[in-house]
């Protein structure tokens, strides 16, 4: 009985090992796009989602907070728990997850820290470092739900987060070049990982 029990226990342990190992093997990549209102984050996020293809999840701060939940923004915004759960889902089930929004560092730092905890070195963060005048110019080329006065009120100069290793996106870069840069960054790391695993 002891030998049979040992064999069964060993088999169960082996099955659990491979199941857990399989779960750990899948770790999606997270792209974070931050910056002031009107800088073009959403446009880039949607274009990047199409470029990356199926199984790419797009988490838009405005969509979650304003449209889905209709809650106020702030340090303890009720959007944070749902955005955190979406990051967890993306890590386990999506090849790529894109998180985009203004997301002031002061208010969303806990979310960025969670992103690092979940995705580790698979976090690719970009900050749209544009002048106020440039964001207004870009905003005026689209359908406007708000104006320059609101944008001035929301404005935060160079709100880089020390919780993220953010690369700066400047006004010289258009949507296509930004998408290509991010795509190139993702592929460069993918090739390096494949080389190291040989």
Which functions belong to the PLM regions below?
Residues 78-120:
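Glycine-rich phosphate-binding loop used to anchor ATP phosphates in small-molecule kinases
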Residues 39:
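ATP-binding Walker
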Residues 42:
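Walker A/P-loop
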Residues 46-88, 92:
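Conserved substrate/cofactor phosphate-moiety recognition/catalytic segment
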Residues 141-198:
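Small-molecule kinase domains that catalyze NTP-dependent phosphoryl transfer to phosphate-bearing small molecules
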Residues 33:
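Hydrophobic anchor at the beta1->P-loop junction of P-loop NTPases
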Residues 36:
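P-loop (Walker A) phosphate-binding loop of NTP-binding proteins
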Residues 119-138:
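Conserved phosphate-donor/acceptor-positioning beta-strand/loop module used by diverse small-molecule
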